[in-house]
A protein has these predicted regions:
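Extended substrate-binding grooves/exosites of carbohydrate-active enzymes
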Residues: 1-211
Length: 212
């Protein structure tokens, strides 16, 4: 690395600051990061009790299934963003693929942002919210994308958007508001917890200003 002045780090973003201080002339980047495993459209709750795999042999698309050598998309992105000298990161992986069965025993991995059928997992919308610099229409993506749970069950709702001010409306009224800040780890998405009630509408709105 000292010869090329270029250093890629696999799952060791924690070393960035130390190595940058020792070698300020190095170009540092994340050569392999994240490794969150997800089954598209499968949600296991609560969010804070994430497991690699559940009794149904599926991972959770909330982003709370992480391998022991990896990090959540939020943690991985935040560590990279905090290192202003970092060139960026390569996330493992863009697509699910056959082989390296994780979790075992299945024929394919679940690391992808997009599954083997070409459909976006919820992490796609997170990365779009923080990476997309094109002048496109603003968007909101709500996770879980399905709304079918047990009556009264507390549901963690994650909202990804390029809009900074998010309001959640539930049961016909404004339920709560959050601020998204793409430079702060615990504000990379808007997170709400609501009790599930069948046939009660849930809607999310995003704004550029808190005064809207």
């Amino acid at each position: 690395a000292d010869y090329l002045k270029l250093a890629g780090y696999n799952y060791t973003e924690k070393l960035y600051d130390e190595h940058h201080e020792k070698h300020p002339d190095w170009v540092i980047y994340g050569s392999e990061t994240a490794s969150t495993v997800r089954s598209r459209g499968i949600y296991h709750l609560p969010y804070d009790t994430g497991l690699l795999v559940y009794d149904d042999l599926q991972c959770s698309d909330l982003g709370n299934s992480v391998v022991n050598w990896g990090a959540s998309p939020f943690r991985s992105f935040a560590m990279d963003a905090a290192a202003e000298y970092s060139m960026g990161q390569f996330v493992w992986t863009g697509f699910d693929y056959i082989g390296e069965p994780t979790p075992y025993n299945t024929k394919n991995s679940y690391f992808g942002i997009i599954d083997t059928a070409g459909f976006e997992k919820d992490s796609f919308w997170f990365y779009k919210s923080v990476w997309d610099i094109a002048e496109e229409e603003s968007f909101i993506h709500v996770s879980p994308c399905c709304w079918d749970f047990n009556e009264g069950q507390l549901i963690d709702v994650l909202v990804y958007s390029d809009l900074p001010f998010i309001r959640l409306h539930y049961c016909g009224e404004m339920y709560d508001g959050k601020v998204i800040d793409h430079l702060t780890e615990d504000k990379l998405c808007a997170r709400f917890t609501v009790p599930f009630h069948k046939n009660k509408p849930l809607a999310v709105r995003g704004y550029l200003s808190p005064d809207c």
